[in-house]
A protein has these predicted regions:
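Membrane topogenic/interface segments and analogous intrinsically disordered interaction regions
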Residues: 1-267
């Protein structure tokens, strides 16, 4: 039989759980509201967002008049606009979603842990935007120029072969590249967090550099379309970020050593 004391302990432990679940529900609802509002806003301007995403193709062919995209069934362009709206909503609502996650986690962190967490919260979207910019200004223009350059003009002995991307396939391509670059550009954040947790150190990263090169190219081959241009466009910046991560981890180790020396001096 359970005693009154044990029942009180069960009730006391149950109360914090209910409070956490209530808080989680509140944060999820706020994040969902932000996403839905951004979705409708982006859907209203989906045409303009898509036109902006198509600009690397426009640059490759020379002018908007020469850029032709097609869709092969009636609702394809509508579904593409819905995808554009969802893509834009996720991008624009991310600061709100990240803040809700932070506000849910922050009460369980010490003050110094909260201060340490904030730079990563800021660095994550910044690095993602840099990755997306690399896609928009470097990878996609190179890929589009290469694709347009493969066209064949009609002659007396050969047919005309034109590059006519589908609206859905173009969107899928640029979204895949943006997500691939955005995720890979989080490498400094991930490795620095692992260093703070004591799982890796700068010497480990230096020793495994040759293996990192192989892994990066394999990941680039998996995440990008099967063409050499986009694979190299992803692999090269990621390797540079790996080197930057070594510097970041070295700084973490230096600060940790200084903090330990200060504590030892106080003792």
């Amino acid at each position: 039989m359970t005693t009154a004391v044990e029942e009180d302990e069960v009730e006391a432990s149950r109360a914090p759980l209910i409070e956490h679940l209530t808080e989680l529900r509140s944060r999820l609802i706020k994040a969902l509201i932000a996403f839905v509002l951004m979705f409708f806003a982006c859907f209203a301007g989906a045409k303009y967002i898509y036109n902006a995403l198509v600009w690397p193709y426009v640059l490759a062919v020379g002018s908007p008049e020469k850029a032709h995209l097609v869709y092969t069934h009636g609702l394809e362009y509508l579904f593409t606009q819905i995808q554009v709206a969802a893509f834009g909503a996720g991008f624009l609502a991310f600061p709100v979603i990240a803040m809700q996650i932070y506000k849910f986690v922050a009460p369980g962190l010490y003050k110094n842990e909260r201060r340490a967490f904030v730079p990563y919260l800021v660095a994550t979207p910044v690095l993602f935007v840099i990755g997306a910019a690399c896609v928009y200004f470097v990878a996609m223009p190179l890929l589009m120029r290469f694709s347009v350059g493969m066209q064949q003009l009609a002659t007396d002995t050969s047919p005309s072969i034109e590059f006519l991307p589908k609206v859905s396939e173009y969107l899928s391509l640029i979204m895949t590249l943006i997500f691939a670059f955005g995720i890979c550009f989080q490498l400094p954040v991930i490795l620095t967090l692992l260093a703070r947790a004591g799982i890796i150190d700068s010497q480990f990263l230096k020793d495994k550099r040759r293996y990192a090169v192989v892994v990066v190219f394999v990941i680039a081959a998996v995440l990008t379309p099967p063409d050499v241009i986009s694979q190299f466009a992803l692999a090269v910046p990621t390797l540079l970020l790996y080197e930057a991560s070594i510097l970041s981890v070295t700084m973490v180790e230096k600060k940790r050593a200084e903090a330990e020396a200060a504590r030892a001096a106080e003792e």
